[in-house]
Amino acid sequence: MRRLSLWWLLSRVCLLLPPPCALVLAGVPSSSSHPQPCQILKRIGHAVRVGAVHLQPWTTAPRAASRAQDGGRAGAQRDEPESGTWRPPAPSQGARWLGSALHGRGPPGSRKLGEGAGTETLWPRDALLFAVENLNRVEGLLPYNLSLEVVMAIEAGLGDLPLMPFSSPSSPWSSDPFSFLQSVCHTVVVQGVSALLAFPQSQGEMMELDLVSSVLHIPVLSIVRHEFPRESQNPLHLQLSLENSLSSDADVTVSILTMNNWYNFSLLLCQEDWNITDFLLLTENNSKFHLESIINITANLSSTKDLLSFLQVQLENIRNSTPTMVMFGCDMGSIRQIFEMSTQFGLSPPDLHWVLGDSQNVEELRTEGLPLGLIAHGKTTQSVFEYYVQDAMELVARAVATATMIQPELALLPSTMNCMDVKTTNLTSGQYLSRFLANTTFRGLSGSIKVKGSTIVSSENNFFIWNLQYDPMGKPMWTRLGSWQGGRIVMDSGIWPEQAQRHKTHFHHPNKLHLRVVTLIEHPFVFTREVDDEGLCPAGQLCLDPMTNDSSILDSLFSSLHSSNDTVPIKFKKCCYGYCIDLLEQLAEDMNFDFDLYIVGDGKYGAWKNGHWTGLVGDLLSGTANMAVTSFSINTARSQVIDFTSPFFSTSLGILVRTRDTAAPIGAFMWPLHWTMWLGIFVALHITAIFLTLYEWKSPFGMTPKGRNRNKVFSFSSALNVCYALLFGRTAAIKPPKCWTGRFLMNLWAIFCMFCLSTYTANLAAVMVGEKIYEELSGIHDPKLHHPSQGFRFGTVRESSAEDYVRQSFPEMHEYMRRYNVPATPDGVQYLKNDPEKLDAFIMDKALLDYEVSIDADCKLLTVGKPFAIEGYGIGLPPNSPLTSNISELISQYKSHGFMDVLHDKWYKVVPCGKRSFAVTETLQMGIKHFSGLFVLLCIGFGLSILTTIGEHIVYRLLLPRIKNKSKLQYWLHTSQRFHRALNTSFVEEKQPCSKTKRVEKSRWRRWTCKTEGDSELSLFPRSNMGPQQLMVWNTSNLSHDNQRKYIFNDEEGQNQLGTQTHQDIPLPPRRRELPASLTTNGKADSLNVARNSVMQELSELEKQIQVIRQELQLAVSRKTELEEYQRTNRTCES
C-alpha cells in the first residue's frame, strides 16, 4: 500500500510539472511499471482508437506558384479552401500501396511535398491507413500488445459509404459547427477514441475543430498546409504545418551566411516567379545584411549567347562590390551551365563565394564543372505527405503509451463516449493525454517532431552542409562541414571556403601522403610471420608490434626504422600479410600514399572503458594512427566518434561449437535407407511373391498339380523364399518358378534388389562410422543462451563488436558470459578444441568463424544457428577525415570491378573440412561397437526362432487336428506343400521302376514291389511315419533264380552247401496282388486306394513281417554258430 501511495503521489506531481517529470519517468525501470490492466484491456478490445475527420482530398499547386501567391509567409491565412475539384481516387492510388513496409519509407509513387510542376492530389484517408498499418508493425510502440485503429468519419464520398463523384471539397460537410459536432459525436466519438486527427483546409474548419476539442475534451491534431493564426491557445487542439519544412531553406541559407560573415551578397535567380520572400524578410530584419543586386537570368537561359553576354555584364558590375553570390531556383543542369561558362570565359571573380540557396538532393550532387568552395545544403531524404500523417499518428501513440504506464485507466478509457453525457470531472482522459502530447519528442519520418508553445507541432529536418574541396589527391570532392539542427549550424570540421580558395593551387600537384596505419591480427584478414635474419620481409609488409599505444614510442620506433641506422629491436618486427594488407597496398597505389604499419598495442578493437576509448578507436582518436585496416566492424557507438568508409566486407555474427564423434547407435545399420524405403522394399517383396504364385498356378507350364506332371509344387512360401533369397543374396536351395512370366518377374525383382543392395552398401560405411554430435543452438535467441543450464559456457572476444551487441541487446546474457570472454578469436577457438573444452560455444563474426572451420585439421568445429546482427567491415579513419569519401569510392570501384572477389577467393579458398581426403583405415575402420546393432538383431533372431518352434508345436498339436476334424479346407498345396501333407497323411505313392543304382523313394505305410535286373522281386516295407530317414527291409521273395545271394567260403563244398541254402522253409504270408494306386505327381492318392487300405490290413501285414524277420534272425544266429565252429576246426587241423 505504501508503494502504491508513493506512485499515486508521484503521478500527481508529474501532472503539475510535466517537463521535468518526463526526464524522471524515462529513468524508471520497466520492472516498476504498472501491472497489466487486464480488465481495461478487455473493455477497449486491446486497441487504441484514433478518430479522423475532414478527410476531403487536397489539391496542391506547384511549389513556385503557390509560394509566390501567398508571399511565402507561413502565417498567411485563407478562410476559403484552395480551389480545385475533388475527384475520387484513381484505381492506381490509395490502397495499392497500403502494404508497404515501414522501412520502405513511404508508398510507391508518393510525391514529395513541393515537387513537380503541376497540381497533385493528396489523399488523407489512404495516408491514414498506410500510417496505421506501418505503426502496428513497430514492436514496443504501444504497451501490453495494444494495436492502433483509425475510426473515420462517414463523409460524402469517404468512409464506408459509396463514393459520390459529385461531391466537392469546397462544399462544407456540415452547414454549421453544431451540426458538425453532432455528426462527429454520432460517427466517431461513440466508438471511444483517444484523440482526433483532422485535415482542415480553411479557417472555418479550424474553428469547428476548436469547438469539438473544447466541448468534448478530446485532443485534436490538425494537419494543415499553412499554419492558421488562432486567437486562443487551446491546449487540446494542436496543428502540424507542412509549410514549416518548405520554408526552412531560407533559415539555413541565412545561417550559412552569418557563420561565414558574408553579409554583403547578391542574388541570382533562374526562375522569375521563384519565392524568395522568406529569405528577403530574414535578411531585411538583420541590419548586418546588405543586398547588392538581384540578377534574374530566367529570360536568358534559353540562349547560350544571350546568357553569356548577360552574365558578363552583370558579374563585371559586382566584381568589386559583392563577395558572395546566392543562387535560387536553379536546377543542377543550369548551375553547371553557368559555372562552366564563367570558368571558360573568366567571368567569375576569383574570390567570389557561391552559395546554393535551395535544398539539394545528396544523390544529385556532382563535382564536374563546379567551382571550388561552393557551399550547398540538403537532406538525405525528402519528406512526403504520408510521412507527416504517420508522424502525427505516432505522436498520439507515443503519448498514449507514456500515459498508460502511469495511469492506464485514465489513459486508455475515453472519458467522453456520449456527447449527451459529457463528464465534468477535474481531469478528463483528453486533458490527461494532452499533457503528454505537449512533452513528447521523437525522430520521425518527416523530421524531428516536437511541440512548441503547447499548440504548434513542428517537424524539423536536419540539413547537412557540404563544401566542394580538393582531396589530398587533387580531385574535387564534397566534404561535409556540419548540419543545421534546432535553428543553428553545428559544424563538424573541415577547410573553410576562403582557406580552400587560398590553398587550392597547392592541391593541383599534391605531395605524396605518408600515413600511419594500425591493424589487428585476425585471420585471414591479417597474418603475421617472423622477419628474416636481416630484419626484412621477403613477402608481405613490414610492421611493428611495439606492444604499446604510446604515440611518442611509436614515433621514435618509426623514425629509427626509416633512418640509415636501423636500431629497432628485431623482436618488434613482423611481416604482415592477408586480406586487408592486400587491400591496403592497392589503396596506397591508387591514392598515391605511403604508410607505416603497426599492430595495436592492447590487441583490442575498441570500446568505451574507464572514461576513454581503447584499441583501434583510441589510437584513431588520439592521433596515434591515421587509418585502421583490419576486420573492423562498423557499429553505432564507433561511428559516433570516428569515420568509417563504406564496408568492404559484409558479415554477421555467428556461433561456433565443437563436434564430438560418437559410435553409431544400435539401429544404425538401418540408416542408409529411409524408413519409407524399407517399408517400400518389404511391401514390394510380398506383392512380388503374390504375383509369382498367381502366375505359376495360372500357367499351364507351372510347378502345380495341374502342371506338366511335376514332382514338386511352387507355393506362396516358395515364392517368399525366392524373393528373400534374391533380396539378401542368399545362396540357399530354392524352387524357382517354371512358367515364363514367373521367370521374367523373378529376374525383374533381382534387378530391383541389386540396385537397392548396392545403394545400401554404398551408404553403409559412412553411417556405421558414427555421427558427430554438437550443441544444437538455433541462434542468439536460443534458450540455452538466455537461460544457460549448469555448466554451459559461452563467450566472445572482449571489447569487440560482438560483445557490444550482446551487452546492448541482452544485458543479462552479457553479465553471464563476461566470465568466459577471451582476449582474441584464436583463444576462443582453442578453448573449444581443448580436451576437456573450456567453452561450449563461442560467439564472434561469422567471417572469422568460417575461416577457422575451414582450416580445422581435426574437423571438430562447426557453425550453428541462424546468423544475426548483420554488419560490415570498414576502414576506420579519424573523425571528419577528408580521405573517407575517396576511399569509399575506391572500395565501390573494387567491388564492381571484381577486385574484392579476387581477394575473397585468394584468402578464403581453403578446402572445406568435409571435402578433405583421409586414410581409409582412419575413416572406415569399424569395431564391434559399430556393429552392435547387428549382434542384437541376431540375438533377437534366436529368440524368435524359439517362438517359431513353439508355434510349430502349437500348429501340429492343436491347429492341425482341429482342421482335420472340423474344417472342410483340406487342400493347401497352393500355400504350403508341407502343411498339405501334414493334413493328408494317408495316401499312396505311385509305383515307380527301380534299378540297382537308383534309390527307391519312401512312402507312408505302403509296400513297393520292384523288379531288379535279375527279375528278383523285392518288397519294401517302410516303417510308420517316423521321419525322413526310414528303415528299409528288402525281402528276396524269389531266390531260386540264377541271380541268388551266396556266401563265399574258402572250401568250395562248404561254399556250395551254404550258398545253396535258401529260406524257402520259412512260410511267408501270401501276398495279395494289389492294383497300383493311381497317384498324381505330387503324391496325392486316389480315393479308391485310400478306402481299400484300412488300418486292420496294415496291422496284419506288419505282424507277418515281424515273424519273418524273427525267423531270419534265428537262422542267421545259428548259421553264425556253425561258421565259428567250422573255423575253429580248420585251425586245429592245420596245427
From Swiss-Prot:
Catalysed reaction equations from the record: Ca(2+)(in) = Ca(2+)(out); Na(+)(in) = Na(+)(out)
Keywords for the protein's UniProt record, in alphabetical order: Calcium, Cell membrane, Coiled coil, Disulfide bond, Glycoprotein, Ion channel, Ion transport, Ligand-gated ion channel, Magnesium, Membrane, Postsynaptic cell membrane, Receptor, Signal, Synapse, Transmembrane, Transmembrane helix, Transport
Topological relation to the membrane, as annotated: Multi-pass membrane protein
Residues linked to a glycan: N145, N264, N275, N285, N296, N300, N320, N426, N439, N549, N565, N886
Alphabetized SMART domains for the sequence: Lig_chan-Glu_bd, PBPe
Cited Pfam families: ANF_receptor, Lig_chan, Lig_chan-Glu_bd
Residue ranges that the UniProt entry lists as topological domain Extracellular: 27-674, 762-932
Top-level taxon of origin: Eukaryota
Region (PPP2CB binding site): 951-987
Region (Disordered): 59-118
Subunit structure comment from the entry: Heterotetramer. Forms heterotetrameric channels composed of two GluN1/zeta subunits (GRIN1), and two identical GluN3 subunits (GRIN3A or GRIN3B) (in vitro). Can also form heterotetrameric channels that contain at least two GluN1 subunits and at least a combination of one GluN2 and one GluN3 subunits (in vitro). Does not form functional homomeric channels. Found in a complex with GRIN1, GRIN2A or GRIN2B and PPP2CB. Probably interacts with PPP2CB. No complex with PPP2CB is detected when NMDARs are stimulated by NMDA.
Role this protein plays: Component of a non-conventional N-methyl-D-aspartate (NMDA) receptors (NMDARs) that function as heterotetrameric, ligand-gated cation channels with low calcium permeability and low voltage-dependent block by Mg(2+). During the development of neural circuits, participates in the synaptic refinement period, restricting spine maturation and growth. Forms glutamatergic receptor complexes with GluN1 and GluN2 subunits which are activated by glycine binding to the GluN1 and GluN3 subunits and L-glutamate binding to GluN2 subunits.
Name the record gives this protein: Glutamate receptor ionotropic, NMDA 3A
Lineage, highest ranks first: Eukaryota, Metazoa, Chordata, Craniata, Vertebrata
